Amino acid sequence: MTYIVTDECVKCKYTDCVEVCPVDCFYEGEFMLVINPDECIDCGVCVPDCPIDAIKPESPELIEWVERAKDFIENQGWKNITKKKCALPDADKFKDEQDKFNKYIIKNMH
């Protein structure tokens, strides 16, 4: 099992979670963070530190997020992040928007 960063993180990228992770398993892309499922120890320490509730426990309906995280780390070269940074400039504007992954990540991959 692992924890998963979901759609809520897209275009916000609050990084409060990375500082509390005991195994430094967060990776950073331009618009969001992901958790490396092979490094996560399923402790859940990061969950309460996410101000937008973007981190969820692995479940069958979220399995696509596990595959996306692996792809971003292994094939897209996302780098490990271990220190808190400022959120994206328009994070407050985007925090309640839905379907951000399809609107902003998928769109930029083509």
Swiss-Prot record:
**Entry keywords, A to Z:** 3Fe-4S, 4Fe-4S, Electron transport, Iron, Iron-sulfur, Metal-binding, Repeat, Transport
Any one GO MF term held by the record is:
3 iron, 4 sulfur cluster binding
Gene3D superfamilies per UniProt:
3.30.70.20
Instruction: Please verify whether the record's keywords include Transport.
Output: yes
Which InterPro entries does the record associate with it? 4Fe4S_Fe-S-bd (IPR017896), 4Fe4S_Fe_S_CS (IPR017900), 7Fe_ferredoxin (IPR000813), Fd_C (IPR022569), FdxA (IPR054829), RnfB_subfamily (IPR050294)
Highest taxon in the source lineage: Bacteria
- Per the database record, which ranges form the 4Fe-4S ferredoxin-type domain? 2-30, 31-60
Provide the binding site for [4Fe-4S] cluster.
21, 40, 43, 46
Which parts of the sequence bind [3Fe-4S] cluster? 9, 17, 50
The cross-references to Pfam families, in alphabetical order and at most eight, read: DUF3470 (PF11953), Fer4 (PF00037)
Quote the PROSITE patterns the UniProt record gives: 4FE4S_FER_1, 4FE4S_FER_2
- Cofactors required: [4Fe-4S] cluster; [3Fe-4S] cluster
Q: How does the cofactor attach, per the note?
A: Binds 1 [4Fe-4S] cluster.
Note the NCBIfam families from the entry. Answer: FdxA_Protbact
| Cited function | Ferredoxins are iron-sulfur proteins that transfer electrons in a wide variety of metabolic reactions.
What this protein is called in its record is: Ferredoxin
Q: Which organism is it from?
A: Rickettsia typhi (strain ATCC VR-144 / Wilmington)
